[in-house]
């Protein structure tokens, strides 16, 4: 029985032969999280403006602001990764220098969701 795969570019397939769709998307998301949005990038092509929305200036004590940030992040992820059909983003923990998120995504042709727990600390997402 063949396992379902997600359509990816030829270059991606050549680099990641044998990697599961979940692992491939996880790696791509980690690249997204460790990149920044270009300021004033509204006029640039989408290929040049992918990146993580900045959260350091967000009031982490305000739930409405955190919900807004989750919506912005969700939109950025869905623009970046077309193999995600459904995505939920929620804040697990938020402090001045750290932010912990929970992501649950349904990928094309995959019966099981991809679940990620990701946290920002010491200048990078892990």
UniProtKB/Swiss-Prot annotation:
One of its GO terms (biological process) is DNA damage response. GO terms for molecular function: anti-sigma factor antagonist activity. SUPFAM superfamilies: gpW/gp25-like. Keywords: Cytoplasm, Stress response. It is found in: Cytoplasm. Pfam families: GPW_gp25. The keyword Transit peptide does not apply. GO terms for cellular component: cytoplasm. InterPro entries: Anti-adapt_IraD (IPR023776), IraD/Gp25-like (IPR007048). Interacts with RssB. Belongs to the GpW/Gp25 family. IraD subfamily. Inhibits RpoS proteolysis by regulating RssB activity, thereby increasing the stability of the sigma stress factor RpoS during oxidative stress. Its effect on RpoS stability is due to its interaction with RssB, which probably blocks the interaction of RssB with RpoS, and the consequent delivery of the RssB-RpoS complex to the ClpXP protein degradation pathway. This is Anti-adapter protein IraD.
């Amino acid at each position: 029985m063949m396992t379902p795969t997600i359509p990816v570019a030829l270059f991606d397939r050549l680099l990641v032969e044998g990697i599961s769709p979940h692992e491939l998307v996880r790696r791509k998301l980690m690249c997204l999280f460790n990149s920044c949005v270009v300021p004033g990038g509204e006029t640039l092509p989408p290929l040049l403006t992918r990146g993580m929305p900045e959260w350091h200036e967000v009031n982490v004590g305000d739930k409405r602001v955190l919900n807004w940030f989750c919506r912005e992040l969700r939109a950025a992820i869905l623009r970046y990764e077309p193999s995600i059909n459904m995505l939920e983003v929620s804040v697990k923990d938020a402090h001045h220098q750290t932010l912990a998120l929970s992501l649950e995504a349904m990928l094309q042709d995959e019966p099981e969701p991809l679940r990620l727990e990701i946290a920002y600390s010491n200048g990078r997402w892990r």
